[in-house]
């Protein structure tokens, strides 16, 4: 059984842990993030986000995790994302990730912190592209789960899904880099891993196979399939789906939109048939 290394210390008071540190890694479910941000002080810290959630501000605009943290604090926020299963990291399998930053000096510091013999990182100044890859690839993985055991269709969905990921990201933040999506570990690499092994994909498979496809099933499946673990994937589906609907982008992003309809609307059955037959 795996154990934490001896230099890892646990605190019951989050503020004590933060006050003792100058680099903070945030890896919590996104639906709890704002509540926690209101209770802590991250000013003048280096913050590394592993959170794969998207938010909507008071004006109805999309906000990424890094952007949300920067709304609360004067701090330098970095995004770390890549194709990594915790069990594989624990085995010290060769792995990689992408560090998304706004300045190279901080990026090099974080790279030095994470790099070792089996874990390699690459730096990019496309922080927003890295974040959007992490958010949107989880939605495509939900679609893969809906398809079930159809390998040819899954390959088609991944290919077209990657294109929709990049096109939608350009609409949200027009300075994202194509390289981030098609050549980086956080893009095509993480998309592949998540679509094969991701928890969202597993959850979606059970969701589509249930007798009644209903949005209320998501929380029930988290309890039964994931033993109560909370994941952001289906919540991100809802936010992105409503965004596409609001902006009349339905025909530009049929994969994202049909995944949303299966997950959160009364048109689930019809949309599931469409997804399986009209990719």
Predicted regions and their residues:
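Short, conserved active-site loop motifs that form the nucleotide-linked donor/cofactor pocket
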Residues: 7-9, 119
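Glycine-rich beta-alpha junction loops
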Residues: 54, 81-87, 103, 125-130, ...
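Catalytic cores of large soluble enzymes that bind and process phosphate-bearing ligands
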Residues: 25-28, 61, 102, 157, ...
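Internal alpha-helical scaffold of NAD(P)-dependent oxidoreductase catalytic cores
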Residues: 39, 68-77, 94-181
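NAD(P)-dependent Rossmann-like dehydrogenase/reductase catalytic/cofactor-binding core
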Residues: 4, 137, 142-145, 152-155, ...
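Conserved N-terminal glycine-rich FAD pyrophosphate-binding loop of Rossmann-like flavoproteins
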Residues: 1
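General beta-strand structural signal in soluble alpha/beta enzymes
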Residues: 49, 77-81, 121-125, 253-255
């Amino acid at each position: 059984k795996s154990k934490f290394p001896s230099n890892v210390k646990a605190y019951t008071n989050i503020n004590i842990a933060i006050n003792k540190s100058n680099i903070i890694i945030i890896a919590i479910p996104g639906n709890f993030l704002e509540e926690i941000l209101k209770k802590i002080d991250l000013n003048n810290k280096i913050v590394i986000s592993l959170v794969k959630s998207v938010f909507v501000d008071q004006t109805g605009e999309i906000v990424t995790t890094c952007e949300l943290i920067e709304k609360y604090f004067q701090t330098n926020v970095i995004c770390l994302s890549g194709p990594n299963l915790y069990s594989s990291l624990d085995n010290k399998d060769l792995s990689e990730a992408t560090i998304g930053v706004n300045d190279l000096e901080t990026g090099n510091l974080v790279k030095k912190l994470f790099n070792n013999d089996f874990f390699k990182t690459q730096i990019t100044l496309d922080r927003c592209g890295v974040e959007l890859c992490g958010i949107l690839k989880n939605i495509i993985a939900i679609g893969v789960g809906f398809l079930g055991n159809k390998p040819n269709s899954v390959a088609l969905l991944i290919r077209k899904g990657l294109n929709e990921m990049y096109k939608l990201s350009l609409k949200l933040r027009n300075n994202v880099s194509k390289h981030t999506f098609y050549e980086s570990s956080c893009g095509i690499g993480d998309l592949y891993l998540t679509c094969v092994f991701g928890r969202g994909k597993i959850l979606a498979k059970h969701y589509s196979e249930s007798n009644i496809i209903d949005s209320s099933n998501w929380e029930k499946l988290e309890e039964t399939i994931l033993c109560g673990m909370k994941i952001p994937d289906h919540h991100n589906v809802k936010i992105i789906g409503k965004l596409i609907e609001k902006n009349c982008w339905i025909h530009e992003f049929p994969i994202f939109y049909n995944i949303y309809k299966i997950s959160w609307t009364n048109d689930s059955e019809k949309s599931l048939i469409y997804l399986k037959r009209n990719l």
